[in-house]
Amino acid sequence: EFTTVGIAEKVYFANEKVIQIYLQSVETTKTSEVQLKSFATYLNMNDVEVSFKPSTLFDHHLFAVGTTNSGKSTSALSILDKLIEENKKILIIDPTGEYRDSFSEQEVKKLNLGVDTIVSPSKLSMQQWSVLFEMNSNTQGAVLAEAIKSLRYQHKNGENCCLEKVGKNIAQLQKDLSSIQNDDNDFDISLLPEQIAAESVEEARKGGVYDYSIFRANSNSYLVQKVSYQLSNTNFLDFFKYDPQKKNLLDEVKTFIHTPNASLYINSSELGASEGIGGMIIDLICNCLISQDEIIPFVFFIDEVHRYTKSPYSEEEFHDGLVLLAREGRKKGIFLFLTSQNPQDVSPILLGQMGTLLIHRLTHDDEIRTVKNHLDEYSVKQVKKLNCGEAILTSVNLINNIYLNITKCKRKQYNDTPLL
């Protein structure tokens, strides 16, 4: 942290008492909180243990970033360990399953997405369905909405097949469909491609009934293929389905945020890394959280967040749920704790909301340039040289950047690198 002194310059050696006074003055947070237990030691300061108030780390959100094998996951677990010991509420999203045995059942409630927990179709808005299936025109979105409405009607009446409209009286069918109530939202997603094809109808010239439309069938064919591909070539149906025997993800999240001293762990390792489903589920959770009132404050931890930020359909687009939470969540007591290998994998808007960064080794100039505004000139030069487990903590709540050596906690973590 200190540059080499010049010849004939005065040098002062700080004893342990002076070091402690300096370290206690680094935090600018004036709250009366009790500091968390030490999760690291200071580099170049006789391995003095570091302790911070929770608000110093989280009140402007925390982002841990570093290349693979730089120690960021170990750092994250060390911080989570101290939060759990202090009975702080945590919501954990684990995309790889490496934290699945880190916490006991008494400490956190564990859910396995796609195994014992699903997302009921009733929890998705039409806009979210449109994004998920990459609707590229208003026409496609309207057809999808009509198909979903028809399947909701079928599910309400206990029918396990699509709604055939050809030959049906238009006025009567519209009356039947209007009987759907706000709580009649569940439907069988596996029937969606077939129902979209069944929406290829138009008003017959006589009789006031629906007739098959070749023009609409041709127009809808691409949408049918797209939805069929998503359902048959991904694990989509493992997560989005109506199954009263399994836990509903959003219901579990709502219960968690209103339960004191409770933590929730969600294992999302069954999600495909590049199928877009993960980003949509995170969006759902974020929108669910931001819509709730009287939330008991908690830390929302998402490991490897780059899996959930970028849209799979465009390199320039990002899911906006996390951005919304970063902007508005703090007012409701929701504090983000994110990890990623590359700071460029999150949107610039989201990165701009991160007031505290735990920076591990970064090697690419573009990556370093992204976090350059958070570092002084000396720190920028040191980022490439950090060893595994070493990090620079920079925050709006600290007077100076601090160099840390993270202390590995004793909790089990599946992140060891296999020997070649």
Language-model segments: which ranges?
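Short loop/turn elements that form and flank the Walker-type P-loop nucleotide-binding site
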Residues: 57-59, 85-87, 259-261, 293-296, ...
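Conserved nucleotide-binding/hydrolysis micro-motifs of P-loop NTPases
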Residues: 96-100, 270-273, 306-307, 342-345, ...
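P-loop NTPase motor domains
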Residues: 97, 101-103, 107, 121-324, ...
